[in-house]
Amino acid sequence: KECMVDGTVCYIHNHNDCCGSCLCLNGPIARPWEMMVGNCKCGPKA
């Protein structure tokens, strides 16, 4: 299965498709909301 490269926007439904991790700007507390609004992007594995 192909994975999404760093910089690709990741949402709740596809956050596991990142090659690395799905990183959100405001940290884990705001994560569900951030993912819904598209503020999270794939990045290096944590």
UniProtKB/Swiss-Prot annotation:
GO terms for cellular component: extracellular region. Residues 31-33 are annotated as: Keys region for toxin activity. InterPro entries: Insecticidal_knottin-like_sf (IPR053718), Toxin_28 (IPR012633). Expressed by the venom gland. Gene3D superfamilies: 4.10.40.60. It is found in: Secreted. The presence of a 'disulfide through disulfide knot' structurally defines this protein as a knottin. Belongs to the neurotoxin 16 (SFI) family. Insecticidal toxin. It inhibits insect voltage-gated sodium channels (Nav) by partially blocking the channel pore in DUM neurons from the American cockroach, not by acting as a gating modifier. The inhibition is only partially reversible after prolonged washout. In vivo, the toxin causes flaccid paralysis followed by death when injected into Heliothis virescens larvae. It also causes uncoordinated movements followed by full paralysis to sheep blowflies (Lucilia cuprina). Disulfide bonds join 3-19, 10-22, 18-42, 24-40. The keyword Disulfide bond applies. Its main location: secreted. This is Mu-segestritoxin-Sf1c. It comes from the Eukaryota. The keyword Lipid metabolism does not apply. Keywords: Disulfide bond, Knottin, Secreted, Toxin. GO terms for molecular function: toxin activity. It comes from Segestria florentina.
